[in-house]
Design a protein with these regions (language model features):
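N-terminal nucleotide-binding beta1-loop-alpha1 segment
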Residues: 1-19
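Catalytic-core segments of class I nucleotidyltransferases/pyrophosphorylases
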Residues: 114, 124, 152-235
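A short, N-terminal amphipathic alpha-helix
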Residues: 31-48
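A conserved acidic beta->alpha catalytic loop
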Residues: 56-58
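Short catalytic helix/loop segments, enriched in acidic residues and glycine
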Residues: 20-35
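Conserved beta-loop-beta/alpha segment of the NTase-like Rossmann-fold superfamily
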Residues: 60-61, 68-145
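Residues at the starts of beta-strands that form the adenosine-phosphate
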Residues: 2, 47-49, 72, 98, ...
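Short internal beta-strands
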Residues: 50-54, 132-134
């Protein structure tokens, strides 16, 4: 699978909380978050790496230009209004094939990255069009809830569903899902959650793989929580 990291957001809540560096450069487990994700994707086995990075953050581009990873790395600069738009922008330059995609603010344990990557590859090979990483751990101010039957996603909702299960910002995309994302933006769909809802409503095969905990780094407190969580595991 090709690897894609979406880093097109402004990171306004981090900045408002006093974090001076762009979100992709915040330190998680002792290294810039975007570097950690690229190293993780390399370890997982991605055949290529693409980062869609906000054009307002030249420091991120400079950092990546000075780094070398195993697979070839392409940096796409963008100024997009939503993560769905950033996804569509990033997909445009990726060769044919399935894509393993993460938001830049997603934090998981190494073993959970391996579980999600492995399941995404299997489920896509077995006919799923889109695979979502999900978790019962809710730390988002506006979570996207998922209802499942086995591995299959039956509903995507803004309202809580039982048992509690929310998306975590990590996706496996087939060729069909790649095309659907680009088409959705062309049709005026504005948010990632609206895209996910539409795929399920259309009867597309959307699968989920659950892990115990996923942290989204939106606020300074999230950054502290993520670093404390990962540090505790290493003791």
């Amino acid at each position: 699978m090709h690897g894609l990291i979406l880093a097109g957001g402004e990171g306004s809540r981090l900045a408002a909380g006093g974090i001076a560096v762009p979100k992709p450069l915040v330190e998680v487990a002792g290294r810039p978050q975007i570097v950690g994700l690229l190293e993780t994707f390399t370890t997982l086995g991605c055949s290529s790496l693409t980062c869609a990075v906000r054009a307002d953050f030249p420091a991120v581009r400079r950092l990546l230009d000075g780094r070398r990873f195993g697979p070839p790395l392409t940096v796409v600069t963008c100024r997009t209004p939503s993560s769905l738009h950033t996804l569509a922008e990033g997909l445009q330059g990726i060769a044919a094939g399935p894509v393993f995609c993460s938001m830049v603010d997603t934090v998981m344990r190494p073993e959970d990255w391996e579980a999600v990557y492995g399941a995404a590859g299997r489920y896509l090979e077995e006919g799923a069009e889109l695979v979502l990483a999900v978790t019962p751990y809710v730390d988002d101010e506006s979570p996207v809830y998922v209802s499942r039957h086995g591995r299959d996603v039956r509903a995507v909702s803004d309202e809580p569903l039982t048992p509690v299960c929310v998306t975590g910002g990590v996706y496996g995309l087939s060729a069909a899902a790649r095309g659907a994302a680009v088409d959705a933006v062309a049709r005026g769909v504005h948010k990632m959650r609206a895209f996910l809802k539409a795929l399920v409503a259309e009867g597309r095969r959307v699968a989920a793989v659950e892990v115990p905990r996923i942290i989204d780094i939106d606020r300074p407190s999230d950054l502290q929580t993520a670093n404390a969580w990962l540090a505790a595991r290493e003791r």
